[in-house]
Amino acid sequence: HYCFFDYKKEQYGLDWNAIYDKYSRQIADDMTDNQLFEVLGNMLGELKDGHVNMYSSWDVARNWSWHENYPSNLSDTLINRYLGTDYRISSGMRYRILDDNIGYIRLQSFASSMGEGNLDEILYYLMPCNALIIDIRDNGGGLVTSAEQLAARFTNTPLLVGYMQHKTGRGHSDFS
């Protein structure tokens, strides 16, 4: 169900069928679960995609180089200076009122859902502020619905935020 085969082929010549052939030769009936996990993890690593992971009860196969080579777009020192330790936490958001009556929300991930009640409380607390900073730098992503839910609090107008494609068949390019 991977949607980026064509893109990866264009970007760096990925030939998934050749990769399949390469790694299928390394799989044997007498392999342990750990050995199979390692081979399949290495195979998925060929995709060079930080969003492709394989989970087992003992480990997660992931593309570490994607995370390690991802350019940092923030300074922990700067975050600590502004956010400090006197902040509130709700639904994965850290928030506080900064000097000059500026509201600040730090959102490092959209991995979990935000409760409407939690958002109500946070925004009510920050309502008297003269301005609001929503800091999503270094956000690892997650649920599109969480990002939409937060953004919807700042407009009354329906707004197109993107498109999604769904897998419709077994072929590499079978998407809606």
Q: Across the structure, where does each feature detected by a protein language model lie?
A:
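Flexible, low-complexity junctional segments that flank or bridge functional domains
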Residues: 1-176
